[in-house]
Amino acid sequence: MRQTFFLPSHVEGCCAALRRAGYAAYPVGGGVRDLLLGRAPQDWDVTTSARPEEILALFPGSVLTGGVHGTVTVPTPGGPVEVTPFRAEGGYSDGRHPDAVSFGVSLEEDLARRDFTVNALALAPNGTVIDPFGGLADLDAGVLRCVGNPARRFGEDRLRMFRALRLAAQLGFALYPTVEAALADAPSPANLAVERVGAEVDKALLSPRPGWVGEMLRYRLLVPWLGSTQADTTPLAALPARPLERWAGLAGLLDDGELPEKLR
């Protein structure tokens, strides 16, 4: 794991502007995780003590894109940065979205609502990694572990079950035993939008380990759309990592020519 961290200038600039205005600001989430793994982050998120209206006032041209979550997309020369206030969430009656969101909480409270320990990491201004839930050790061990109780986390947002398997495919990580147990007793994901499910399947299919899509079948996560189909998906790794080939390969293994349409 890398020990020296160089933030892209547009991310550092976004954080610096928030700090000059008197707010705390930390790069957080998947961008930090990928930076620590030596991977090129695809997206950057910043969490801050500023509220949505304060973020919008500070960055001309920024747009509120996260609705009740308060996420503001800040355009920069290096690409957009998603800036979100520290927040806590409560109640998930639909198994996907929080019933209530509150701002003005601490950084640790914000990190505590996140899905996996490796995504609950933040970078302090001096480059120190803020890691209240053991995410660094899990990165070193190559395991995906939930923040808190995995059954509760999956019950809050059932798309997290798909994210667990997709991240395992992308990162080459193993699932922590408690995560495996929660998946084996998972709630039905039938309430999820098929487009969101299909996007997670697509990312797993195009990863270096597309056979993990078979785990989605084994854990019966795709039953609402595909029924109880099972298949050995290891041959997918031999196909070029292009959407047409991988989707066609999966459709062939499942003997379902309509598969792509069912998950889009």
Name each region found by the language model:
Residues 1-264:
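Catalytic cores of the polymerase beta-like nucleotidyltransferase superfamily
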